[in-house]
Amino acid sequence: MGAQARRERLAQLVAPILAEAGLDLEGLDITPVGKRRLVRVVVDSDDGVDLERIGEVSQKISTALDEVDVMGQSPYVLEVTSPGVDRPLTEPRHWRRARGRLVHAPLVAGGQVKGRVIDADETGVTFDVDGQSQVYAFSDLGRGKVQVEFRHDDAAD
């Protein structure tokens, strides 16, 4: 079985497990690491993902992999994780999950926008830029990036 076919079969295998847990599949990679393969499944949800949910779906995915031959006879390591803060915002759901966060995004027409995400829907995102509300369609934005903040002025001390 080729790498692409294996990846597609694996995605089909994990999809119902993740759907049952209320999680979205954000990424799926199979990478050779020495004599083994690393199977990395990246999951997320609008509520975020805690370690307990990661552990539960990891166990279910592991059991499902043991029941089928999608990985063949080669040994593998399964890693189920959530996306890091450096994941680019490319889908409407990514922008929704960034509500309240400071985001920097290039504009397709040139320039950039840097502001706090107020709201996002299926068509675009609303930023607070220096106290002013600015709305952009997703088609006007490049890949957004959440800015790491160690202290937010509105945060409680």
From Swiss-Prot:
Record-linked Gene3D superfamilies: RimP-like superfamily, N-terminal (3.30.300.70)
Keywords annotated in UniProt: Cytoplasm, Ribosome biogenesis
Record's subcellular location: Cytoplasm
Primary localization class, coarse: cytoplasm
UniProt-listed GO biological process terms: ribosomal small subunit assembly; translation
Source organism, top-level taxon: Bacteria
GO CC annotations on file: cytosol
Function, as annotated: Required for maturation of 30S ribosomal subunits.
PANTHER family from the UniProt entry: RIBOSOME MATURATION FACTOR RIMP
Similarity field: Belongs to the RimP family.
Protein's recorded name: Ribosome maturation factor RimP
Species of the source: Thermobifida fusca (strain YX)
